[in-house]
Amino acid sequence: MAFIDPAQLDLEDRVVAINRITKVVKGGRRLRFAALVVVGDHNGHVGFGTGKAQEVPEAIRKAVDAARKNLIEVPTVGTTLPHEVIGQYSGSRIMLKPAIAGSGVAAGGAVRAVMELAGIADVTSKSLGSNTPVNVVRATFDGLVNMKDAESVAKLRGVSVQHLAE
């Protein structure tokens, strides 16, 4: 997977989840916050990151920095995905299916954020198993990373893209 320079892209970020974490110590409770953020350029590049800090804005900033370092390129066919795929992470499984133009993003919270920021306008998804936002985002990314475009499939099979379409 090639490195994608975030400085070259016009990235937008979206906070998917903020969790309050409490650690009970001898003197009482210690509060921290964990943030899950997805960044993307609406043009096939998307990344996610998590950050933890004493304050919410600092946790979000750390998550955005982590997300910018974790960018992937998503293959697209027009406004949708090239083929159906199932992504897995921990107890979460996400099924992503291409949809006809104009159908929109039929996906829940965390998956919707990833798809919209990746620039995928038409997709259907189904979440199977765990619905924890972090696991759902990681499963979605697993599916997107395992997605193949027509050129790579044709190269693997040793045929032309036109022959593959027949």
Swiss-Prot record:
Assembly, in brief, is:
Part of the 30S ribosomal subunit. Contacts proteins S4 and S8.
Comment, domains: The N-terminal domain interacts with the head of the 30S subunit; the C-terminal domain interacts with the body and contacts protein S4. The interaction surface between S4 and S5 is involved in control of translational fidelity.
What GO terms fall under cellular component here?
A: small ribosomal subunit
Q: What HAMAP family does the database record attribute to this sequence?
A: Ribosomal_uS5_B
Q: Which PANTHER family match?
A: MITOCHONDRIAL RIBOSOMAL PROTEIN S5
Keyword RNA-binding on entry: yes
| Location of the S5 DRBM domain | 11-74
Q: Which GO terms describe its molecular function?
A: rRNA binding; structural constituent of ribosome
The free-text function statement in the UniProt record for this protein reads:
With S4 and S12 plays an important role in translational accuracy. Located at the back of the 30S subunit body where it stabilizes the conformation of the head with respect to the body.
Q: To which protein family does this belong?
A: Belongs to the universal ribosomal protein uS5 family.
Q: Which Gene3D superfamilies match?
A: 3.30.160.20, 3.30.230.10
Q: Which PROSITE patterns match?
A: RIBOSOMAL_S5, S5_DSRBD
Q: What is this protein's record name?
A: Small ribosomal subunit protein uS5
NCBIfam families (UniProt xref) = rpsE_bact
The entry's keywords:
Ribonucleoprotein, Ribosomal protein, RNA-binding, rRNA-binding
- Tell me a GO biological process for this protein: translation
Residues making up the signal peptide according to the UniProt record:
none
